[in-house]
Amino acid sequence: MKSCAVSLTTAAVAFGDEAKKMAEGKASRESEEESVSLTVEEREALGGMDSRLFGFVRLHEDGARTKTLLGKAVRCYESLILKAEGKVESDFFCQLGHFNLLLEDYSKALSAYQRYYSLQADYWKNAAFLYGLGLVYFYYNAFHWAIKAFQDVLYVDPSFCRAKEIHLRLGLMFKVNTDYKSSLKHFQLALIDCNPCTLSNAEIQFHIAHLYETQRKYHSAKEAYEQLLQTENLPAQVKATVLQQLGWMHHNMDLVGDKATKESYAIQYLQKSLEADPNSGQSWYFLGRCYSSIGKVQDAFISYRQSIDKSEASADTWCSIGVLYQQQNQPMDALQAYICAVQLDHGHAAAWMDLGTLYESCNQPQDAIKCYLNAARSKRCSNTSTLAARIKFLQNGSDNWNGGQSLSHHPVQQVYSLCLTPQKLQHLEQLRANRDNLNPAQKHQLEQLESQFVLMQQMRHKEVAQVRTTGIHNGAITDSSLPTNSVSNRQPHGALTRVSSVSQPGVRPACVEKLLSSGAFSAGCIPCGTSKILGSTDTILLGSNCIAGSESNGNVPYLQQNTHTLPHNHTDLNSSTEEPWRKQLSNSAQGLHKSQSSCLSGPNEEQPLFSTGSAQYHQATSTGIKKANEHLTLPSNSVPQGDADSHLSCHTATSGGQQGIMFTKESKPSKNRSLVPETSRHTGDTSNGCADVKGLSNHVHQLIADAVSSPNHGDSPNLLIADNPQLSALLIGKANGNVGTGTCDKVNNIHPAVHTKTDHSVASSPSSAISTATPSPKSTEQRSINSVTSLNSPHSGLHTVNGEGLGKSQSSTKVDLPLASHRSTSQILPSMSVSICPSSTEVLKACRNPGKNGLSNSCILLDKCPPPRPPTSPYPPLPKDKLNPPTPSIYLENKRDAFFPPLHQFCTNPKNPVTVIRGLAGALKLDLGLFSTKTLVEANNEHMVEVRTQLLQPADENWDPTGTKKIWRCESNRSHTTIAKYAQYQASSFQESLREENEKRTQHKDHSDNESTSSENSGRRRKGPFKTIKFGTNIDLSDNKKWKLQLHELTKLPAFARVVSAGNLLTHVGHTILGMNTVQLYMKVPGSRTPGHQENNNFCSVNINIGPGDCEWFVVPEDYWGVLNDFCEKNNLNFLMSSWWPNLEDLYEANVPVYRFIQRPGDLVWINAGTVHWVQAVGWCNNIAWNVGPLTACQYKLAVERYEWNKLKSVKSPVPMVHLSWNMARNIKVSDPKLFEMIKYCLLKILKQYQTLREALVAAGKEVIWHGRTNDEPAHYCSICEVEVFNLLFVTNESNTQKTYIVHCHDCARKTSKSLENFVVLEQYKMEDLIQVYDQFTLALSLSSSS
């Protein structure tokens, strides 16, 4: 890889030269300059330092010398840059970014990386830069951009030495984004890598087990946890966390066994967990939940008390305590506990509903209504309709209620309002520190805050004195079985963290003091305001669960005197969690606020910077596990999605338990260590496994960010270099004054992944180089010099640097880049000008120097190509009246029309994204009955059918399961059955529909009534619940013996649409690709959906409707797939792998044209290359489909682009493009110059790579064994990363002996075994054979030119 290290010798010389030019009289200035000069030894030590050492370099204790050296280097670089007015080599900024990153000065690192990105056109070649940039994004929780940066690293350098760290972070971030399949894949890739990592394999295995848990795969999770417990020398903290998770799963999840048995196991596991880590507040809390569920009230209270003593107060814990008090007929204590809960988390829906229930039972409907309204405002209360009905009921009947007197000895509003929020306390400290410089308004504000603070202290002492002896009554338990769901049953989230052994004094609500001073709880130091994170740095964070916004004043009404008990209201009410906070991380939801003592947003914001999941004001007091002299934060949160009954019905709390799984590696052990953060874990029956990824750094640090914060924070601290304004301005660039202001919309813009499409096809795609041999980086990388400071306008054009054009700013003196002995040798050197004209002899001669000629990856196009990017929306945008274009359709009257050559040309024309050929079956006399359900059952009734369970919805709409809002995610769960069983379902569905129609006819007498009822039914469909349907899909008809008649019938089609033909690229693959060069069948009932997608590798497709019903199609041209990809990312969906159904309103607003048409029986739909489409059945019907690859430059280009995009996204390409390209060269005479150039260059590239790798293996003493290849042998893919492996197969010794041949690519083999001692290298093609194919593949003369 290309190094970004600046020659420190050159830097020192340049610095010295500048010093000589200074006036002799400025001795003090010269002395200052000499103080930051670097010695030869220092330059050598710094020569090998870049982002790859992040997390591995020690800066404290014995590493203090390194920290000092890095600080000195930063000052030297800053001084040099300042003197040169920013006109220095771009690599200076990159190295400055690395040094600041290693010093964990993320804002400075970000500024320097920004500058390097704006100056370096081919920044993407620098893997160390991309990695460092990804780490900064990761630190700031800008996961959308961190993912892109890390994927770029793996794309340009798959053998990157920190690939394991990247896969680990990608796994965590995809878990946050609920892309569980991708998350699991990256965790597994991290697990097989033998390179050093900041987490142990046991810790990674824990993440995998927890990932299963978050997907509700409880049995798989249980097996994974139990298997992890069998690991030898398992760290105590990992063991404690695993036992904690197992205990909670037995209590809360649907595991085998009766309730008593599961509770018994749960208690045993939790007790064992506490033996391993007695200071885990979370385990104590879970134990309290278990005791509560079996009626052991005193034990439950003791456990809750321990939880509060061991960790900071959480809203969930206080809500659970309130429920127990309520059960014991202690309404006043219950009231105080609920008040504590809502003070700690004003959005705690369950606590508000519990409080409302309490007021209802005491005949205070108006107060109950206020609480219910607060609950309804919470994002975590999804079932607002039931709650609204309850509020309406109380409003209508409140006049009949009898009021009583308050049980409270003091106004609850007073308690609530006197608790200063952490923001106000911080603001008070700031005002006190600047007392002498305040204006009159600020002085008045200071007086008010000080007065309120004194009253709060007085109230606290008064309450402690009043209730010192208050406790739990020892009377009979009114309900021997306390509610098991006294807090929401959301799955908690295993977390690997540590709690500070010395809690810092903090501010807590007065009611907390009161209840802690009662007989049931000790009045120990239980801060809810601050926590000290263990580690070498004393970072003090204000806890996010002590938030009591000023808007809440007066929202907690008085509790009137009433002697009634507190009955359970058995009103079903769901209070599920809020939408996952990750949705706000994508495009400008994060503020980049960070101060030395607090991460709060500022005095004007009531919420902390970052909410980890459904517990929006989540307690963030976690650290982690002792490791070898390094600190690592590896959070992992649970963002529950399941519904949980509220306390209005059975006391279920809903504050989401988001826990950060954080390992802390340090040199000194701590007494109090917990792998689970002591946070609110009112968790529910599911866990969305959201990883609160706060930093994976070599120091413990946390960023509490606000998931719903405004994109622009005017009062946020500046992220620039505050101690050097001049340097700050230089690093920003004088033309860009808004860089680094602490807002996420600025941060998002820094990433080099701005979508751009130039005239050279897709500029950001490797295939942009297809038409030109060696394009200039400037032409293909125009986006790199777009304004890097405002992603709000990513296409703001070129900007100047220091008043000059970019070209001038880059004309500074170039310096040599020294390499330390341990520096990666995978340099990216300037690519040679490559032509497709040279013979194979010249090609091989040019690459006789293994490892020294370009990229190490297997990109089959130009070395100069950056990682691929989706295209932006075409410009100018279409007018609104052009967004519903007519669908290109052709009507066939006879067989001659079907074979008319212009039909083929019309279908394959790139200007036609889709073509509907009407009447094809009739014109060709196709016997569609061969594909009818009846015939299929008669032919092979036990044939396997993949079944997708879906919700019946209108074709142009897609609602969430509750029917409350339109979404992109399309529910489609997979299972399997047989043709016979699905045929039975298909028939019964039809019969049921007939019965429903008959019932409608008998019930309604006139047409108007029918219309009214139809309208009502339509409205109900949108409100849910929706009817469940089953769609039979992907039925394989490839077996010629089983489906001979059906496959023979399809030979009647014209050649361009046939499954097998000489002009079909997929025919030349040489082996079967199910569903692509074979036929697949689909069996449908009304509403069956094929979600949005592009065909595999962007190949064309043919689809024929067998009937008897119709299908409705929605089609978007290929040019707009980037827009749909962006929509998917905004909705936390994977464009390639997820199931999604576009919202037509969103597409209309984005000016995306949509073709919409009906496919009738006998119609053939031709989907052109790259076209995006989704389909819904209107009636009962069957369809058949397959893919076709026209022999055109457009098809090949789009196929290669998707091949590279799949590689970037770690998705397997079903079509092996390298293998296919060599077969095309053998079998096809190509007359199209563009297509010929693309294929020829692919061959050249692969030939170079093969020669280079083979020579490197021979030079290393690794034997290459001839293996050969059978005729129909499929192309090979790496069993680890799933990239295509051509010719040289790395096979494990064991599989080679057993003849199973488990193939690895070279990079994965090296990661598994650095010296390849466990692998055998098999060769499938002789070099002579490939040389012959390459030389003989020449441009054929077309018929027109020859004539």
UniProtKB/Swiss-Prot annotation:
Compartment annotation: Nucleus
Class of the enzyme per the UniProt entry, highest EC level: oxidoreductase
Residues that bear Phosphothreonine: T887
Ranges for region Disordered: 571-621, 633-689, 757-819, 990-1026
UniProt binding sites for Fe cation: H1093, E1095, H1173
MF-aspect GO terms: chromatin DNA binding; histone demethylase activity; histone H3K27me2/H3K27me3 demethylase activity; metal ion binding; RNA polymerase II cis-regulatory region sequence-specific DNA binding
The entry's keywords: Chromatin regulator, Dioxygenase, Iron, Metal-binding, Nucleus, Oxidoreductase, Phosphoprotein, Repeat, TPR repeat, Zinc
Residue spans of the TPR repeats: 90-123, 127-160, 167-196, 202-235, 247-280, 281-314, 315-348, 349-382
Domain JmjC: 1042-1205
A GO term from the CC aspect: nucleoplasm
Biased segments, Polar residues type: 571-601, 609-621, 782-795
Organism superkingdom: Eukaryota
Keyword Zinc belongs to the record: yes
Membership in a protein family: Belongs to the UTX family.
Protein name as it appears in the record: Histone demethylase UTY
Organism name: Homo sapiens
Gene name of this polypeptide: UTY
